[in-house]
Structures are given as structure tokens and as C-alpha cells.
């Protein structure tokens, strides 16, 4: 895969430039564009993934299905599809927006900061997973209700962005719609 960049943003969310992805994530990470996605299978189960230990930020942490950064000229929806293929080896239905204005800043235990405007999407998988071990060290298909109870009881066990997304009332309602069998 070619070198990825992040799209830097000003405080109003307007693009101001780009920076190589690995170099962008430091103790002083600048605001940049990202995305987050929650994937469901045909049984209505949520895919929860554990980040590979080689990840710069939050290594080994359980999180929602896939996250990443759109590249210049790429829509967030196309970026979701690209990263699902790369990280999970999976095809998905067109991503649906569930929390379009999500923005957060969080610092991991090693001092690496995430500082993102991060629209959140949900989709259904349409093929089997083929996990990229460089990105994901473990995964589990779970009932959404069980995951939400786990987040409510032990938020420290999950990525901060997953917790913030899951505790948004409107996002929970939209996620619940994906648990219904089609």
C-alpha cells in the first residue's frame, strides 16, 4: 500500500494541507480528517476489532470495526470501503452516515494524541473476512447490546472514540437499525 497522508484541518474544518500519516500522530497531533466505521454481518452482529500491537496509537485496544483517513480527492465513504478491504479483506454495502459531526481529541497512555474530525459510518459486510494481521490482532462478532453494556460498564476497555460514539444517543439509535436482519 502506498504511503498514506492525513488531511490537515483548521478549527473550522477547512483543509489546510497534508502530512504523512505516521508523522502526523505525535504528542502534538494537528486537527485532521478521519472516519470511523461500524460493520455488521447478515446476523446483525457487530464486528469489534483489537488493534495490532504495531499500531502507533492505542496498540492492542479493542475498538469498532475499522477507522482511517480519507486521502486527497477521496470521499469518506470511498475511504471506508478502501480501509475495509485493506484491514479486513471484506466487501461492504455502501456506508451510511450515523454520526456525521463527530469530533474528538484523546491521548493514549504513551502520549500519542488523536485529534480528529471523524464522521462515523455503518455498513453491512457482504463477504468473508480476511484479516490483515498488521492492522488487526483479534476480532469478535458480538451482539450490539452486549457491546454497549460493556462500554457502559468498562469504558476503559475500549478505544476512546468508540466509547464517545457509542454513548451518543442518536448514533446508538442508528446503529441499532443495523442489528435488524435484512
Curated annotation (Swiss-Prot):
The keyword Calcium does not apply. The active site is at residues 67, 116. It catalyses: isopentenyl diphosphate = dimethylallyl diphosphate. It is found in: Cytoplasm. Residues 30-164 form the Nudix hydrolase domain. Its main location: cytoplasm. Coiled coil: none annotated. One of its GO terms (biological process) is isoprenoid biosynthetic process. It comes from the Bacteria. Its EC number is 5.3.3.2. Mg(2+) binds at residues 67, 87. InterPro entries: Idi_bact (IPR056375), IsopentenylPP_isomerase_typ1 (IPR011876), NUDIX_hydrolase-like_dom_sf (IPR015797), NUDIX_hydrolase_dom (IPR000086). GO terms for molecular function: isopentenyl-diphosphate delta-isomerase activity; metal ion binding. It is an enzyme of class 5 (isomerase). Mn(2+) binds at residues 25, 32, 69, 114, 116. Catalyzes the 1,3-allylic rearrangement of the homoallylic substrate isopentenyl (IPP) to its highly electrophilic allylic isomer, dimethylallyl diphosphate (DMAPP). Homodimer. PANTHER family: ISOPENTENYL-DIPHOSPHATE DELTA-ISOMERASE. Belongs to the IPP isomerase type 1 family. This is Isopentenyl-diphosphate Delta-isomerase. The gene is idi.
Amino acid at each position: 500500500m502506498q504511503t498514506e497522508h492525513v488531511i490537515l484541518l483548521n478549527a473550522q474544518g477547512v483543509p489546510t494541507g497534508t502530512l504523512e500519516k505516521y508523522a502526523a500522530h505525535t504528542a502534538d497531533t494537528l486537527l485532521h480528517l478521519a472516519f470511523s466505521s461500524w460493520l455488521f454481518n447478515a446476523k446483525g452482529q457487530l464486528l469489534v476489532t483489537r488493534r495490532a500491537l504495531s499500531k502507533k496509537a492505542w496498540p492492542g485496544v479493542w475498538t469498532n470495526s475499522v477507522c482511517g483517513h480519507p486521502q486527497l480527492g477521496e470521499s469518506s465513504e470511498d475511504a471506508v470501503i478502501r480501509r475495509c478491504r485493506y484491514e479486513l479483506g471484506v466487501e461492504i454495502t455502501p456506508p451510511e452516515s450515523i454520526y456525521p459531526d463527530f469530533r474528538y481529541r484523546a491521548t493514549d497512555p504513551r502520549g500519542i494524541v488523536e485529534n480528529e474530525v471523524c464522521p462515523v459510518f455503518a455498513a453491512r459486510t457482504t463477504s468473508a473476512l480476511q484479516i490483515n494481521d498488521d492492522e488487526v490482532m483479534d476480532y469478535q462478532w458480538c451482539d450490539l447490546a452486549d457491546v454497549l453494556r460493556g462500554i457502559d460498564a468498562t469504558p476503559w476497555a475500549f478505544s476512546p472514540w468508540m466509547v464517545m460514539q457509542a454513548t451518543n444517543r442518536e448514533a446508538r439509535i442508528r446503529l441499532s437499525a443495523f442489528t435488524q436482519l435484512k
